[in-house]
């Protein structure tokens, strides 16, 4: 993230703590309140950039922080207990609308409120997850933007086998309590035998599970498919380090993994949903029922390849695969 974006984010966060109580009490005088619950660490630069873009988009739509809108932030990291507590806290601020990111955070929010409008981002398969009735007409007080349908897991396996053609074993790193993660596993299990690949399930719920699962799998070698979750995103450095230590080719679901040293990734750009999410928040603040706003699918997926990591694994990336890539990290 640029230094300008970093300063902007610090200013946006820090300014909230300095507003006088008279300003904070102005909801009845036209100041609208947006609660933001992110399933990541507060100092994560990826999500700082996301929020800077989100806030700027709302400002472009006429919402100026401290004048007619206020933002309340909660960052949960990977802890489900903290997600529950932060969900309760944000509801206690009486927001007009909530921006919630990741499946686990949205699950926590829906256990606390079904009446406050929610716009979700960074969610996989919201229908299977039980968040919405269907994509065109989500119903209730919730809508948003989702990342992946289960079928994309077949692409993860295919790209991994192209960049590491000798693979015969693959572990699917996933949080078993997240329904789409299990669906990803089932798709991979169905496709792998046709490619001569055996599939292992690497279930994780915390950092210790990641260390254990990848160390155990790494003893015999193979490849990794790392499914999306707050846990895998928050602990991406640990996962990437373990993959490097055990020489495990791995594919990830977002480009920021490859930017952090991951071998290959296929998924949406991490900033893609920020401006559309701001548009939905704007519409809800102006009176639109969230249940009437369709859940939006990704506009495109990006393939990102890290050639430096490939070289460290003694892998030669085919030119045909490099030509398909949206970004190649030298």
Can you annotate each of these PLM segments?
Residues 1-330:
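Short hydrophobic alpha-helices and adjacent helix-cap/hinge residues
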């Amino acid at each position: 993230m640029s230094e300008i974006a970093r300063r902007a984010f610090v200013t946006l966060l820090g300014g909230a703590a300095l507003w006088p109580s008279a300003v904070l009490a102005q909801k009845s005088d036209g100041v609208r309140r947006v609660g933001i619950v992110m399933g990541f660490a507060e100092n994560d630069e990826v999500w700082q950039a996301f929020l800077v873009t989100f806030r700027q988009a709302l400002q472009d739509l006429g919402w100026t922080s401290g004048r007619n809108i206020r933002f309340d932030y909660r960052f949960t990291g990977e802890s489900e207990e903290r997600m529950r507590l932060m969900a309760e806290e944000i509801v206690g601020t009486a927001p007009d609308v909530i921006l919630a990111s990741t499946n686990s955070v949205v699950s926590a929010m829906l256990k606390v409120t079904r009446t406050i409008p929610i716009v979700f981002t960074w969610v996989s398969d919201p229908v299977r997850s039980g968040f919405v009735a269907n994509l065109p007409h989500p119903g209730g007080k919730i809508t948003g933007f989702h990342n992946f349908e289960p079928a994309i897991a077949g692409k993860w396996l295919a790209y991994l086998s192209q960049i590491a053609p000798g693979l015969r074993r693959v572990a699917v790193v996933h949080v078993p309590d997240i329904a789409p993660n299990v669906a990803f596993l089932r798709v991979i299990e169905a496709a792998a035998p046709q490619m001569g690949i055996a599939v292992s399930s690497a279930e994780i719920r915390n950092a210790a599970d990641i260390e254990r699962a990848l160390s155990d799998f790494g003893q015999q070698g193979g490849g990794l498919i790392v499914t999306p979750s707050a846990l895998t995103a928050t602990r991406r450095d640990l996962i990437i380090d373990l993959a490097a230590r055990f020489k495990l080719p791995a594919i990830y679901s977002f480009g920021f993994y490859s930017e952090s040293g991951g071998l290959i990734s296929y998924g949406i750009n991490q900033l893609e949903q920020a401006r559309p999410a701001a548009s939905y928040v704007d519409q809800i603040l102006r009176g639109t029922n969230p249940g009437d706003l369709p859940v939006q699918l990704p506009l495109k997926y990006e393939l990102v390849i890290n050639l430096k990591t490939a070289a460290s694994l003694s892998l030669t990336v085919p030119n045909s695969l490099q030509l398909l890539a949206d970004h190649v990290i030298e």
